[in-house]
Amino acid sequence: MLQVLKLFAAMCSIGLMAEIRSKSNKKFMLLSALGIFMVVDSHTWTAFNLFISFIPYNSFFMPMFVFISGYFNKVGSDTRLGKYTLKKMKTLLLPYAGISLAVFGLQFLINWFKLGEIQPVPSGYLLYVLENVITTGTSNSMATPMWFVITLFATLMIYALMKKLLGKVWNSYVMLAVFTCLHLGVIYLVKTVGPEALIYWLLPLKVLFFLPFLEMGIIYRDHLEGLHTKLTGGVKIGIMTVLLLFNMSRTMYLPNAYDVAFDDIGELAGFTSPYIVTPLISSIVGILFWLTLVDLIGKPVQESRFVNYMSCNTFWIMGFHIAFFNILNCILMFINEHIVDVLYFDTEFFKESEWYRWELVDGFKMAYVVIGILGPLGLKWVFDKLVMTVGKLFKKKTPQPQA
């Protein structure tokens, strides 16, 4: 039993991001916590408007996660690829499998509750899931955001292989230029051909899309962070103001204001801007804005234990928040059917879709944000306690060797 729990713990943890500890880099701790907050908020159709009128979440936050990974990336020509691959499998693929399996179980129970019957598993479902994992990266609908884990793993592995082969002659600025050209080529290809025709090429194309942001994180760490940190508060406010005005001007000349964003990057869709450079510019603007804001005003919350715990468990939030949205909907449906009418709660819509949100008043979106963050974190806390308790019980029962 203990070994099963330990294995599941490994599968549902995310290396350094899942340990109960205090992160030493407080700025990037806060940045990752803000990033996962934005993921949850965007899936509630934005309960909290964090500058999204100027810088929409979907214009930068997934590239920002890759930028953060790049900041901490230390691979080089001396990296042992076998050891590195095993490490990334443990910290990325095992958590992906564990969380996806757990969400599948929750989805089964939620569907049983809201439909009133057990849904049969379709024939060939496992093959369908495996195909999705290596294309879109999604194992099931309630774990849709976990596509990012597969893409991040592939991006890190391709980058490590290139750095291993070319590390001794590697120039970050030259490689950033190369990666940028490949990134623009991906956008052009997708807009020209369409993502539907590239379904089996989605994963390598997403890797090419994200590579420049990985290199940007490394360049920032090695060459720019010191300069950026030393800027005065007035200069940082000026930078943020210029970025907001710049994005505002972009929304004025694009066909639609929201063209600065790209909604469905997991399937390389949603690139509505006529310019292939738009996603790159939008991502740089968003990353630099929030990086500067965190550097400017982040210190009061950087010591928060809750923010630290949230940052350490971003993958739990990423994987479970939609399931907890649906748990809240199940509660509302039960109240609506057995206690008192919940005004305008659309039971039929909820039965058909995991993405239904009750929106009688706009402020109720906050309830989804709260449960989407506290639910997964509470589940993680209970899980950690369970593993620790069972571990202690088994340790006590283990016979000690005689002297």
Map each language-model feature to its residues:
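Alpha-helical transmembrane segments and their immediate juxtamembrane cytosolic regions
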Residues: 1-403
